[in-house]
């Protein structure tokens, strides 16, 4: 069925349903209920009490597991006389490893791209023939 046919039938049926039945034109009464009058307060029942006092187990505190050790931090004091020596050591180490024996070539990159595109085309044609 077409969408327009379904939409037209739906509109006609909703109009027919809206016309039937008597309407109440009287004034509605409003009832106001405050939160303090209900049975729930802050997510708990107001009228119930705990049967026994909870015991402190020592493993949980404030809803979290309390056996996790605190992180240990240490403070290291650095003298001004140590900084130039360490800076020179870093520069010297960097200059020793400046050369590398690796070479790169991009001469055959176009061939590899063409082969992969050709393979993808063959796979696409094969899939089309199967379907």
From Swiss-Prot:
Q: What induces it?
A: Induced during cell wall regeneration and upon milbemycins A3 oxim derivative (A3Ox) treatment. Expression is also regulated by SSN6.
Write down the superkingdom of origin: Eukaryota
Q: Which residues are covalently lipidated (GPI-anchor amidated serine)?
A: 105
Composition bias of kind Low complexity appears in 97-110
Q: Where is this region: Disordered?
A: 42-110
Could you tell me the keywords of this UniProt record?
Cell wall, Glycoprotein, GPI-anchor, Lipoprotein, Membrane, Secreted, Signal, Stress response
Q: One Gene Ontology cellular component annotation?
A: side of membrane
Coiled-coil-forming residues are: none
Give the membrane topology, semicolon-separated if more than one.
Lipid-anchor; GPI-anchor
Q: Where is the signal peptide?
A: 1-18
Where does this one sit in the cell? Secreted, Cell wall; Membrane
Task: Name the propeptide positions.
Answer: 106-131
Q: What happens to this protein after translation, modification-wise? A: The GPI-anchor is attached to the protein in the endoplasmic reticulum and serves to target the protein to the cell surface. There, the glucosamine-inositol phospholipid moiety is cleaved off and the GPI-modified mannoprotein is covalently attached via its lipidless GPI glycan remnant to the 1,6-beta-glucan of the outer cell wall layer.
Q: Where is the composition biased (Basic and acidic residues)?
A: 42-59, 79-96
Q: What does this protein do?
A: Hydrophilin which is essential to overcome the simple stress of the desiccation-rehydration process.
Record family assignment: Belongs to the PGA14 family.
**What protein name does the entry list?**
Hydrophilin PGA14
Its lineage reads: Eukaryota, Fungi, Dikarya, Ascomycota, Saccharomycotina
